[in-house]
Amino acid sequence: MTVTPERSKVLYFTPAYYYTPAAAAVHEDNTDITNLDTDLDGKRIGVCSACTYEFYLDRSLNIPGNYEFVVDNPQIQTYDTDSSAIQDLALGDGVRLDAAMSSLTTLQEAVDSGTPIKIVGAPLYYEPLAAAIDKKAPADPRPLLDEVSKTIKEMHKDGTLTELSNKWYGYDLTKKQGA
C-alpha cells in the first residue's frame, strides 16, 4: 500500500519494500507527446480513480520523496482500473485518450503483451509501498508490525527483495529513487 500522511493516521506502516515508478504512455502511433514536462499539458489522460496517478495530475499527491508536478491543466479521465485506461488508450491515438498513467511495470507488461502503446519519458515520481496494519485492530497490532518490519529489513539487507525485483521486473525497484 502507498504510504501517505492520511493513511498513517489510521494505519501502521512497515518500511517500504518497493518503490513504484509512475509513468506515462501514449498510443504507439503518437508522435506529438515526447516531453512529459510540456507535451501532456491540457491532454486527456486516463488514470485509475482515487489512485496516486489521479492525485499527481490534480496536484494533491502527498507521498514521501521528491517530485515535481509538471503537467498543467490535464483533462483527467478516471477509470475503475489502470487496465481500463490502457484499453481505451489502445483504441487509437487520441480516440478516447491522449495518454495514460500507471506504474511503469503495468505499462511495460501491456507493451510486452502486444498492446499498441509506448512508454514516454522517465518516471514522474516513485511511490513507496509498504505493508499496512490497522491501528485499531482488536489485538495490539504492534508486535505484528515489528515482526513484519524486521522481516522486510532483513530481506533488504540480505538482497532477497532486490533478487525478486530483478527476477520479476528486470531491475531493482527496492531502493529509494528520485529522493
Locate predicted features.
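Flexible hinge/capping segments at coil-to-helix
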Residues: H27-C48, S60, P64-Y67, A139-D140
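Periplasmic-binding protein-like
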Residues: Y19-V26, T52-D58, L104, Q108-A179
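A ligand-binding cleft/hinge motif common to bilobed small-molecule-binding domains
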Residues: M1-V10, Y56-R59, A90-Y126
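Ligand-binding cleft/hinge of the Venus flytrap
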Residues: Y53-D80, V111-D112
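Short helix-initiation/N-cap motifs at beta->coil->alpha
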Residues: T31-I33, V70-D88, E127
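Hydrophobic residues within well-ordered alpha-helices
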Residues: L40, L89-D93, A131, V148
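Acidic, polar ligand-binding/catalytic clefts
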Residues: M1-D39
